[in-house]
Swiss-Prot record:
One of its GO terms (biological process) is methylation. It comes from Zea mays. InterPro entries: MeTrfase_7, MeTrfase_capping, SAM-dependent_MTases_sf. The lineage of its organism: Eukaryota, Viridiplantae, Streptophyta, Embryophyta, Tracheophyta. This is Inactive anthranilate O-methyltransferase 1. S-adenosyl-L-homocysteine binds at Y20, C61, N66, D102, L103, S146, Y147.
Amino acid sequence: MPMRIERDLHMAIGNGETSYTKNSRIQEKAMFQMKSVLEEATRAVCTTLLPQTMVVADLGCSSGPNTLRFVTEVTRIIAHHCKLEHNRRHDHLPQLQFFLNDLPGNDFNNLFQLIEQFNKSSTTHKGDAATEALQPPCYISGLPGSYYTRIFSSESVHLFHSLFCLQWRSQAPEQLKGTQKSCLDIYITKAMSPSMVKLFQQQFQKDFSLFLRLRYEELVSGGQMVLTFIGRKHEDVFTGESNHLYGLLAQSLKSLVDEGLVEKEKLESFYLPIYSPSVGEVEAIVKQLGLFNMNHVKVFEINWDPYDDSEGDDVHNSIESGENVAKCLRAVMEPLVASQFGERILDELFKEYARRVAKHLENEKTKHAVLVLSIEKAIIHV
């Protein structure tokens, strides 16, 4: 069955050992790193707008515990702001309406179960005057759909958030279909022709521009966006950390082709719908459109192995780290890979991938480059 983004682009479902729920520590660490940026943007909404009902949307929410961590954090920031700035009573706090958005293939059933647990936990605090006085009323809804389309009415959202999503494209470049690969790569490499590399870059420019235009229509005046996603540290498109990460996956798939477990034709037609941009590329599009004021942009790094918190250049156990990296990537890539090559290869593929990552980490400790962008809807004078 051919891969379809709307159907197949979602994280591994359920609560099993290979699920996204059990393997989303990198995203959790990124959320911790961008906490101050989220707080600044949320406070800006509170200070300049503070509506009776604040609408907050998490785009590409997935289904793990990080989604509810975001809800909890925004609620905490708003409650703290209202207490410090206004000393508001509970009945004067703004109501919070959260929309959790992802593609229809997302594990919304698991997400709704987490929401139910969250609501029950919040209910247990009712009757505790000290806690309840600080807790704004909070309502949470799921919203299936692509954020590369309009998903909200005009000027209805106060704060947009997205974590580890905007490296995903709406599709792999259309012009790559039917082209003959000189190599069996699935993402940008130095062996790829300049014209093919340019197609990946153009797809990013098209998608990111569309995303910003859509959100501009949906944000209220003064509304904020905090976007955190995988990028690269350098302007050179061939030096990105993602090139190594996905290059090792391509090598693992090639080895399965050699073993007769994967059809060569299927690998020849497979490209990842991904592009990891530089800060310069992101800034250029924001400035070119002129729809948003840029509050903040920065790059931070996270070790490939989410359980390696060390800051040095040495990997203490490359085999264990290789397995950890493979689990994280499988939780993200499994549905896409399975739709193209079949589920039966998954265990063997990611076993081979773990081995190759371990060998890579023996020679070079590699980190994800993560971009954080905070922008505000600009007032355009006609």
